[in-house]
Swiss-Prot record:
Pfam families: 7tm_2, EGF_CA, GAIN, GPS
Cystine connections: C36-C48, C42-C57, C85-C98, C92-C107, C137-C149, C143-C158, C160-C171, C177-C189, C183-C198, C226-C239, C233-C248, C276-C286, C280-C295, C323-C336, C330-C345, C596-C625, C613-C627
Motif (Cell attachment site): 507-509
Taxonomic superkingdom: Eukaryota
Membrane disposition: Multi-pass membrane protein
UniProt cross-references to InterPro entries, sorted A to Z: EGF-like_Ca-bd_dom, EGF-like_dom, EGF-type_Asp/Asn_hydroxyl_site, EGF_Ca-bd_CS, GAIN_B, GAIN_dom_N, GAIN_dom_sf, GPCR_2-like_7TM
Record topological domains on the Cytoplasmic side: 674-681, 741-756, 817-849, 894-932
Gene Ontology molecular function terms on file: calcium ion binding; G protein-coupled receptor activity
Protein name: Adhesion G protein-coupled receptor E2
Extra facts: Most adhesion GPCRs proteins undergo autoproteolysis at the GPS region of the GAIN-B domain. ADGRE1 is predicted non-cleavable because of the lack of a consensus catalytic triad sequence within GPS region.
Region of interest (GPS), ranges: 596-643
Lineage start: Eukaryota, Metazoa, Chordata, Craniata, Vertebrata
Length: 932
């Protein structure tokens, strides 16, 4: 049956040829033929098995039939080789190579492996195939010399030993000292076969000990040869350790005599260096010492570091100001002048050095000279020095120097023969001859005239003193010449009694000297006094030389020039005054004021000055002067008759009188009319009282200069009263501003809540503070020779102008702000109200506040340039009428006050007719009063 189905299969799928073949075979089988005898019955790689009925083919081991049947027949089926190497279980094992061959596989080991079964083993052969690693390193010579063999699975590797590098197939020695940084700093590298070693350089040692080492992590440390061997350089040298070596040097201040090789012991000697060639600063001396030096500042200098001896070259020697260290170094009546490295002592004017003392010995003393000589006058005047230098030959100086030399001749006769009697008569005659030629002096310049006048006055004074001091001159004398009259008196027993005065007269002039002045003058020996009166001297040393030449005064000399002197060292600052009574050359006019002036040689070359003397009394024929020193004196008449100033005086006088009347009426109004009394009228009252007192004192006391003490007191009160006026003006301005500002909120003056006591403390207290401070700082600032006011020649006037300028600025700002707020308020009210006739009145009141609050004082600042005259008239007119403005605004233009005036005049008392206050604001009354 099997054959039939096979035949059937092939019949359907094969070709006709194969069908015919199958039929033939089948026929043979049916005939009992052994098909296996035919070698072509089965395909290649198959075995044929004959059966009773047929046969079958079976593929050999390692092959598989193409039809997938284990037993098959007939051609068409092929036995295909099985690739055993593709099996997942790796038939040959690890580390092997499987090679497929027909019907089987051949196993061989990979390179580097071997098997006990041989190099090639057929799969299926007897035994077991296993590849194991071959250790190539066991083979001698497999790696080159100086290398190491490293076996690995299936292979090996050769690496050069440490210290060797590969060069192709050989290992050569590596020079580590060349190829890499093998040793640390300060070490030397030494190459060896296959290695290296390091050694520290000379003078250094390995930190780990030992002579040799390897590795950069090690270090070479310096060997301190100096500490290991203290005698290395010798006893007189200093051993200095260096890196890897040492050196020998001399101590500071010494030098080596020979060159020293570093790292070798010292050879030679150390010799001292003289550093003092140019090492100390200027103004110092250098002192060389063994191995060193030090600097010392010269006497009169001190080192900047405070040390007496120093070596620091940054230190300097600075001059010592001995005069500052000890202000009394030169003693009394002397001046100390610092000079580099020292100081100079000199005596004050009118003093001379005591010959028994010296600056060098520290006992420099000055004694008042009894009288001045030529050397005391020359240093004070440049003109005199020119004459002494021979420039008098110049035509411009000939006449002047002739007078100077003639005066010095008189002085030389007095000074050069101090022990010989002095002829006062002869000196007076010579001076008279010079005064006789006084008309020639008008050819001299102002400086030359004052210089010549000074030396002539000093010469006469010295001559009078010399006559009193010389033994033969101890007798009272009266010398009369045409141009000079002298009376001298020696005091014997006249001063034995207390309160006695010595009276001296000359040409109608008189000097009264109290005996207490004789005692205070510290006279030695028999004391004496002298008095002189010069004729014609007043014509040359006239009012042109007045120190305070005010443009507002006409000045004229109206007395002879007189002078007084007293023996003794002290001639000024006496406890009680010396009284001079000088006769007028012309009668004194009522409009004139007498000024006692003394000749001051410290101002330029000489000037008349009122300081030191006071006018005690002035009549038509005489003026009495009180001076605190012996001086040269004269009387200058001052009068204010210039047109412009006189007209301003009249305006000021009339305006002040009008203001006083108005202020008196305003004060009476605020005090007597109870209906108008309120917080505002109290403020007006205080301002009116201060202005009234200030103006009446100004009117009656500004020119009371006869008594300087009383004049200073008047000036102090004026200072206080005018300051109080301005402080109350400030209070008025602030209160007015607060009232207007509060109109925006409610028609009520909330500033009423400010207590009047506080306002009084401000208005009266602050001026007191200013005056006290001013008087303490500058007590001589009150009172001048021509008016009882603050001294305008110094900055003392700013004790008044400073506060005034500040208050004017504040008041002006507050008033501007007030007017701006008021304008807004008026614009916001009913238009009918704004058209009332009161608008013009309110505008007038607003403008008037400028004058009431003192803002017009700013006009005084603009009294300069071409507008000075206009500003002066405006300033004088407006400010003199300040009281009138106050009365006009606060009284006459106030309806309530006018009603009170009307009641007073008509004696009607209608208490029900009270109206509200006038002038919305600027009358300084409550807010909504009416005006009419």
């Amino acid at each position: 049956m099997w054959g039939f189905w096979l035949l059937l299969f092939w019949g359907f799928s094969g070709t006709h040829r194969w069908g015919m073949t199958t039929l033939a075979i089948l026929g043979q089988r049916l005939n009992g033929v052994n098909e296996c005898q035919d070698t072509t019955t089965c395909p290649a790689y198959a075995t044929c098995t004959d059966t009773t009925e047929s046969y079958y083919c079976t593929c050999k081991q390692g092959f598989l039939p193409s039809n997938g049947q284990t037993n098959f027949q007939g051609p068409g089926v092929e036995c295909q080789d099985v690739n055993e190497c593709l099996r997942s279980d790796s038939p040959c094992g690890s580390n092997s190579v499987c090679t497929n061959i027909p019907g089987r596989a051949r196993c061989s080991c990979l390179s580097g492996f071997s098997s006990s079964a041989g190099g090639s083993w057929i799969l299926g052969s007897p035994g077991h195939f296993l590849c194991t690693d071959v250790d190539e390193c066991l083979t001698i010579g497999i790696c080159p010399k100086n290398s190491n063999c490293s076996n690995s699975v299936g292979s090996y590797s050769c690496t050069c030993q440490s210290g060797f590098v590969s060069n192709g197939s050989t290992c050569e020695d590596e020079d580590e000292c060349v190829t890499r940084n093998a040793c640390p700093e300060h070490a030397t590298c030494h190459n060896t076969l296959g290695s290296y070693y390091c050694t520290c350089n000379e003078g250094l040692e390995f930190s780990g000990g030992g002579p040799m080492f390897q590795g950069l992590e090690e270090s070479c440390e310096d060997v301190d040869e100096c500490s290991r061997n203290s005698t290395l350089c010798g006893p007189s040298f200093i051993c200095i350790n260096t890196l890897g070596s040492y050196s020998c040097s001399c101590p500071a201040g010494f030098s080596l005599s020979t060159f020293q090789i570093p790292g070798h012991p010292a050879d030679g000697n150390c010799t001292d260096i003289d550093e003092c060639d140019d090492i100390c600063p200027s103004n110092s001396s250098c002192t060389n010492t063994l191995g060193s030096y030090f600097c010392t500042c010269h006497p009169g200098f001190a080192s900047s570091n405070g040390q007496l001896n120093f070596t620091d070259q940054e230190v300097t020697c600075e001059d010592i100001d001995e005069c500052t260290q000890d202000p009394f170094r030169c003693g009394r009546n002397s001046s100390c002048t610092n000079v580099p490295g020292s100081y100079n002592c000199s005596c004050l004017p009118d003093f001379r050095m005591d010959p028994g003392g010296s600056q060098a010995h520290g006992n420099f003393t000055c004694k008042r000279i009894p009288f001045k000589c030529k050397e005391d006058l020359i240093p004070k005047s440049e003109q005199i020095e020119q004459c002494q230098a021979g420039q008098g030959r110049n035509l411009d100086y000939t006449s002047f120097c002739t007078f100077v030399n003639a005066t010095f001749t008189i002085l030389d006769n007095t000074c050069e023969n101090k022990s010989a009697p002095v002829s006062l008569q002869s000196a007076a005659t010579s001076v008279s001859l010079m005064l006789e030629q006084a008309s020639t002096w008008f050819e001299f310049s102002r400086e030359e005239t004052s210089t010549l006048g000074t030396i002539l006055l000093e010469t006469v004074e010295s001559t009078m003193l010399a006559a009193l001091l010389t033994p033969s001159g101890n007798a009272s004398q009266t010398i009369r010449t045409e141009y000079l009259e002298i009376e001298s008196k020696v005091i014997n027993e006249e001063c034995n009694e207390e309160n006695v005065s010595i009276n001296l007269k000359a040409r109608g002039d008189k000097m009264d000297v109290g005996c207490f002045i004789i005692k205070e003058s510290e006279s030695t020996g028999t004391p004496g006094v002298a008095f002189v009166s010069f004729a014609h001297m007043d014509s040359v040393l006239d009012e042109r030389f007045f120190e305070d030449g005010q443009a507002s005064w006409k000045l004229r000399m109206n007395s002879h020039v007189v002078g007084g002197t007293v023996t003794g060292e002290r001639k000024e600052d006496f406890s009680k005054p010396i009284v001079y009574t000088l006769q007028h050359i012309q009668p004194k006019q009522k409009s004139e004021r007498s000024i006692c002036v003394s000749w001051n040689t410290d101002v330029e070359d000489g000037r008349w000055t009122p300081s030191g003397c006071e006018t005690v009394e002035a009549s038509e024929t005489h003026t009495v002067c009180s001076c605190n020193r012996m001086t040269n004196l004269a009387i200058i008449m001052a009068s204010g008759e210039l047109t412009m100033e006189f007209s301003l005086y009249i305006i000021s006088y009339v305006g002040t009188v009008i203001s006083l009347v108005c202020l008196a009426l305003a004060i009476a109004t605020f005090l007597l009319f109870r209906a108008v009394q309120n917080h505002n009228t109290y403020l007006h009252l205080h301002l009116c009282v201060c202005l009234f007192l200030a103006k009446i004192l100004f009117l009656t006391g500004i020119d009371k200069t006869d008594n300087q003490t009383a004049c200073a007191i008047i000036a102090g009160f004026l200072h206080y009263l005018f300051l109080a006026c301005f402080f109350w003006m400030l209070v008025e301005a602030v209160m007015l501003f607060l009232m207007v500002r509060n109109l925006k909120v409610v028609n009520y003056f909330s500033s009423r809540n400010i207590k009047m006591l506080h306002l009084c403390a401000f208005g009266y207290g602050l001026p007191v503070v200013v005056v006290i401070i001013s008087a303490t700082v500058h007590p001589w600032g009150y009172g001048m020779h021509n008016r009882c006011w603050l001294n305008t020649e110094t900055g003392f006037i700013w004790s008044f102008l400073g506060p005034v300028c500040m208050i004017i600025t504040i008041n002006s700002a507050l008033l501007a702000w007030t007017l701006w707020v008021l304008r807004q308020k008026l614009c916001s009210v009913n238009s009918e109200v704004s058209k009332l006739k009161d608008t013009r009145l309110l505008t007038f009141k607003a403008i008037a506040q400028i004058f009431i609050l003192g803002c017009s004082w700013v006009l005084g600042i603009f009294q300069i340039g071409p507008l000075a005259s206009i500003m002066a008239y405006l300033f004088t007119t407006i400010n003199s009428l300040q009281g009138a403005f106050i009365f006009l605004i606060h009284c006459l233009l106030n309806r309530q006050v006018r009603d009170e005036y009307r009641k007073l005049l008509t004696r009607k008392t209608d208490l029900s007719s009270h109206s509200q206050t006038s002038g919305i604001l600027l009358s300084s009354m409550p807010s909504t009063s009416k005006t009419g």
